[in-house]
Design a protein with these regions (language model features):
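Short-chain dehydrogenase/reductase
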Residues: 101, 119, 135-137
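An accessory alpha-helical subdomain
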Residues: 1-12
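Extended beta-solenoid/beta-helix repeat architectures
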Residues: 113-115, 130
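N-terminal helix-cap/turn-to-beta initiation motif at the start of protein domains
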Residues: 16-17
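Flexible, glycine/small-residue-enriched loop-and-beta-strand segment within the central core
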Residues: 3, 30-40, 45-113, 139-140, ...
């Protein structure tokens, strides 16, 4: 839809998603497997070119920001080549707790919970749970440090 068609966007999201909080915004292009397994629970911003492979539930907490190009992938393929050639796969839920920020082009794998307030660096591959209140990044994604008072932007440095 065009940016000017906000009401139409809301109607599409209400129909597509399992739970769609009124303050959920998704920019195009957006792709998902089913939609009904995606649940937003407050202000949620899903930026351009995101993919959610929702073969299991995906719960997105209030205040979540998902940057451009992020992939939330509940599904996976068998590691064993014989099973993979038979089309055997796996699926596990993903949970983003409140106030999580996922950086651009990151991938979150099935079975992962990202704790409240955490930030995932751009380009990361998150294959294991991340605790609350930390900055984590890398391939594989690892905790770098806790978020502290020093991370607050000073009022004179706020641009918008």
């Amino acid at each position: 839809t065009a940016p000017s068609e906000q009401q139409k966007r809301r109607e599409i999201l209400q129909e597509l998603l399992g739970t769609c909080h009124p303050m959920t915004g998704i920019e195009p292009d957006f792709h998902c497997d089913y939609g009904f397994n995606i649940h937003t629970h407050g202000l949620t911003v899903i930026n351009y070119n995101c993919v959610i492979l929702d073969t299991s539930p995906v719960n997105i907490g209030a205040g979540a920001f998902i940057a451009p190009g992020v992939c939330l992938a509940c599904s996976g393929h068998a590691v064993d080549p014989g099973q993979r050639s038979q089309g055997i796969g796996t699926s596990a839920p993903i949970t983003l707790e409140e106030n999580v920020w996922i950086g651009a082009n990151a991938t979150v794998c099935g079975g992962v919970t990202i704790g409240a307030g955490s930030v995932i660096g751009a380009g990361s591959v998150v294959a294991h749970d991340i605790p609350a209140g930390v900055i984590a990044a890398g391939v594989p994604c690892q905790v770098i440090r806790p978020i502290t008072e020093k991370d607050k932007i000073r009022p004179e440095d706020i641009l918008f």
